[in-house]
């Protein structure tokens, strides 16, 4: 007997592909949350807006180099330039945010950095709103020949689709997965094998002890913000390439889902952030496919509440020991 469409194996595999793609973006965002929390015990709620700024930097590169200014530029080097500009710009933005919004408040009551983070978030959203307007901006309108940013060209910028046993896999989905895996491997090697990685781990374990050992903890913290923001910038560009549109408010919900991924996986744990991102992406895809898009956020944030109640340290996190 043939199962109804909602329970079809083919649909399940398609949703899994979509969920892994989404989860890759959430994992990159979650890594920024978890790295900063691991070192400062600070929740950087402006992180989602750094992701949004990265997406708009990619849009700026595309509109300048992919449109009338250089119409013959090949797509591959153009996409590479978008990634490099967005990652560098987002990384520098993260350093500036740490220096001026968080560093002066390190010894302040814990509520002060949270309020500062919300202020930075609103500042970034409204700055992008003033620069680009409230309408959706589309990545592929320039490449496809339209110079009007209000023209919506549906579909991803990188279009080819492979059909594998009836399941559609877009080339951009493969690119997102490969880039995410590459960045996660690079981050893991950075933290585990390099001097700066050892300094990051020492600072996370005991900041005062690290200072006594001669580690410049201010520089380490700035570098941590830089790396987390670089990953968010890459995720922002991949969102634009995947969904073809960016908007000034896109960082809010993506930031919340990235935070959810970090908490579910175990905030402060790098492998936990990666696992949490995949779980949140898969949950969102399955909920949308089987119950309708309006249920996606309900299920995702319901899981966040459940994890906080049952295992507050997350799946791969460790309980914090209080010193007496």
Question: What is the role of each PLM region?
Answer:
Residues 22, 165-246, 270-275:
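Helix-loop-helix "hairpin" substructures at the membrane interface of multi-pass membrane proteins
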Residues 1-29, 57, 68-82, 108-112, ...:
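Membrane-interfacial amphipathic/re-entrant helices at transmembrane-helix boundaries
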Residues 38-46, 92-138, 190-197, 202, ...:
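Short loop segments and helix-boundary regions at transmembrane helix junctions
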Residues 12-63, 96-112, 264-270:
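Single transmembrane alpha-helix segments in multi-pass membrane proteins
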Residues 69-120, 127, 275-280, 284, ...:
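Alpha-helical transmembrane segments within multi-pass membrane transporters and channels
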Residues 7-25, 169, 190-195, 221-261, ...:
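Inter-helical junctions in multi-pass inner-membrane proteins, predominant
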Residues 104-105, 113-193, 220, 286, ...:
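Transmembrane helix-bundle core of multi-pass membrane transporters
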Residues 2, 10-11, 131, 205-212, ...:
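Cytosolic-side transmembrane-helix boundaries in multi-pass membrane proteins
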């Amino acid at each position: 007997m043939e199962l109804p469409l909602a329970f079809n194996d083919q649909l399940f595999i398609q949703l899994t592909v979509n969920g892994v793609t989404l989860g890759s973006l959430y994992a990159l965002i979650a890594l920024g949350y978890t790295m900063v929390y691991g070192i400062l015990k600070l929740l950087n709620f402006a992180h989602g807006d750094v992701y949004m700024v990265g997406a708009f930097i990619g849009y700026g590169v595309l509109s300048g180099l992919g449109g009338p200014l250089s119409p013959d530029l090949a797509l591959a080097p153009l996409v590479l330039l978008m990634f490099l500009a967005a990652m560098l710009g987002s990384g520098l933005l993260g350093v500036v945010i740490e220096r001026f919004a968080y560093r002066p408040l390190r010894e302040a009551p814990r509520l002060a950095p949270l309020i500062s983070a919300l202020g930075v978030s609103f500042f970034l959203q409204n700055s992008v709103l003033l620069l680009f307007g409230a309408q959706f901006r589309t990545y592929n309108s320039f490449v496809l020949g339209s110079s009007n940013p209000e023209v919506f060209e549906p579909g991803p910028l990188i279009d080819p689709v492979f059909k594998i046993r009836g399941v559609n896999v877009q080339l951009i989905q493969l690119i997102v997965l490969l880039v995410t895996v590459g960045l996660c491997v690079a981050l893991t090697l950075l933290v585990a094998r390099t001097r700066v990685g050892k300094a990051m781990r020492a600072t996370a374990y005991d900041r005062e002890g690290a200072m006594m050992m001669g580690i410049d903890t201010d520089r380490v913290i700035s570098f941590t913000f830089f790396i987390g923001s670089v990953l968010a910038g890459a995720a922002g560009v991949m969102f634009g390439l995947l969904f073809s549109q960016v908007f000034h408010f896109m960082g809010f919900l993506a930031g919340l889902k990235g935070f959810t991924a970090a908490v579910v996986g175990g905030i402060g744990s790098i492998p936990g952030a990666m696992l949490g991102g995949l779980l949140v992406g898969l949950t969102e895809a399955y909920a949308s496919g089987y119950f309708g898009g309006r249920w996606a956020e309900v299920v995702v944030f319901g899981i966040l509440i459940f994890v906080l109640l049952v295992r507050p340290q997350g799946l791969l996190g460790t309980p914090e020991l209080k010193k007496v």
